[in-house]
């Protein structure tokens, strides 16, 4: 996930819009993002992965990648 290190706010906004457009239920995807971010925050408490990227941003980026690049999770 090193390609996420140089994201600016416009990239994050674009990815968020991409995620919202890919789903039919905005509420459900928002809850999923929040739950993933919360889970990741507590699971990775010992791991200092990248303090620049907040858990919610990381969750959005991961979910967009999973939706737009299904080959990532099929391997």
Curated annotation (Swiss-Prot):
InterPro entries: DNA-dir_RNA_pol_omega, Pol_omega/Rpo6/RPB6, RPB6/omega-like_sf. GO terms for biological process: DNA-templated transcription. GO terms for molecular function: DNA binding; DNA-directed RNA polymerase activity. It catalyses: RNA(n) + a ribonucleoside 5'-triphosphate = RNA(n+1) + diphosphate. One of its GO terms (cellular component) is mitochondrion. Its main location: plastid. The keyword Chloroplast applies. Keywords: Chloroplast, DNA-directed RNA polymerase, Nucleotidyltransferase, Plastid, Transcription, Transferase. Its EC number is 2.7.7.6. Belongs to the RNA polymerase subunit omega family. NCBIfam families: PRK00392.2-5. May be involved in RNA polymerase activity. HAMAP family: RNApol_bact_RpoZ. This is Putative DNA-directed RNA polymerase subunit omega.
């Amino acid at each position: 996930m090193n390609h996420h290190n140089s994201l600016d706010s416009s990239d994050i906004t674009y990815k968020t819009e991409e995620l919202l457009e890919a789903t039919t239920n905005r509420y459900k995807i928002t809850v999923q993002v929040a739950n993933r971010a919360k889970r990741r925050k507590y699971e990775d408490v010992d791991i200092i992965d990248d303090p620049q990227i907040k858990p919610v941003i990381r969750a959005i980026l991961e979910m967009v990648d999973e939706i737009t690049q299904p080959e990532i999770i099929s391997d």
